[in-house]
Amino acid sequence: MRIMLVNHFPLDGSGSGTYTKNIAVHLAMRGHQVCVVFPENEAPQEIPGVSMRYVRFSRYVPRKDALPFNFPCFTTHPRSVTTFGDLDGGELAQYLTAFDTAIMQAIDEFKPELIHAQHVWCLAWLSAQHGIPTVITTHGTDLMGCEKWPEFQGFAELAAKRCEKIIAVSGDNMRALHCRFPETVERTVLLHNGYNEDVF
């Protein structure tokens, strides 16, 4: 199967980044074709057998080949302290435009049969608009983001409405999701995070 993964953060330094990277690695090991769309402010480590599509951001000073600000987060990240609430209207428009372009280009070239987006948030909303079955994993910080920045609630609502399924990584996340978006109850799957048996 051709599966496109979309995340709001790089593939290291955050829970959802690590989650996305591990999913990509293991799907590729099982013979699936995988593409990942994500933000980056430095050269990413390649994953064998995985197509990497990233939107470039500026970490310290604006770069010509990148958006002139750092990638936004819900809290902080080892490589960014910018939050979604820090973005002004122009920066948010640049963010959405850059990711919409990257997602549409990946869809056109990679031709995914399924999209798995992380967080009930902006990029899940962008991903779910193209008529391709979309699954979203809620990690909890997205739901906290709706509380913290109500101006982003609309993106989350549309993402939740347009996706086929939502994966909750814990019972608490599932309850918070259903409280905020009651229409998702029938489409939610509880799937606890796994672990690497080779390590633990």
List each language-model region with its residue ranges.
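N-terminal subdomain of nucleotide-sugar transferases
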Residues: 1-59, 193
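Acidic anion/phosphate-binding donor-loop and adjacent secondary structure
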Residues: 32, 146-148, 178, 195-200
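A conserved catalytic-core segment of Leloir-type glycosyltransferases
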Residues: 36-109
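Short His-centered aromatic/hydrophobic patch
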Residues: 96, 117-122
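Active-site proximal beta-strand in glycosyltransferases
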Residues: 114-117, 125-146, 167, 186-189
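Short, well-ordered alpha-helical microsegments
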Residues: 122-126, 174
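Membrane-proximal helix-turn-helix segments that form the acceptor-binding/catalytic region
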Residues: 149-166
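Carbohydrate-associated surface elements
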Residues: 172, 194
